[in-house]
């Protein structure tokens, strides 16, 4: 098969309606804002990533990976940037036609290691989804981030991740996706053993992408 023939064939497969669609995968462009509130550190960044979603009966899995480059904003106490790789994953079970309960993980690694906080946490929460029009679905997610671990130490009794998403079927198997997530970890540290102080961390992540269903 020639390259000239292969291109139209792949396009036709992408645009053909999918019966019983179970898997979707695609690229994402990402914008992010990261703050360590007490120390006056604030960064903005962007990058690229990918997402995978799969469903079988009432169960579904979702994963997203992104690589971000951050730079300090005006007025930040930071004088240099860093890169971060973030992995988000969920396993969900539908309890109703419009709602699921879910568990998962959040993992963010940072380079250079101590320019910002690397974080790992377990997700426990729920999501709801509503069809707002033909081929268009809006999703709201709320997760408690349990047992977070920080590269710089400390603990956080209250950590939340909230998300809003939109999925629009553009043509057949091809979807457009947009998500916005906000998480805040009310971290506390005890530097030098002199007593605990507040050191909260918050991050916002906006993703815009395409997904191809199979």
Where are these regions (language model features)?
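Cleavable N-terminal export/targeting peptides
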Residues: 1-24
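Short glycine/proline- and aromatic-enriched beta-strand/turn motifs that initiate or cap beta-hairpins
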Residues: 18-75, 205-214
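Repeated loop/turn-to-beta-strand initiation elements of outer-membrane beta-barrel proteins
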Residues: 23-24, 57-63, 97-101, 133-138, ...
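Residues on the lipid-exposed face of transmembrane beta-strands in outer-membrane beta-barrel proteins
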Residues: 27, 50-56, 89-93, 105, ...
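Transmembrane beta-strands of outer-membrane beta-barrel pores
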Residues: 29-35, 56-58, 65-71, 105-111, ...
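Outer-membrane beta-barrel translocator domains and adjoining extracellular loop/strand segments
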Residues: 35-43, 71-82, 111-119, 149-160, ...
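Residues that define the transmembrane beta-barrel architecture of outer-membrane proteins
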Residues: 42-48, 55, 81-87, 97, ...
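Predominantly the C-terminal beta-signal and adjacent terminal strand-loop region
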Residues: 156-214
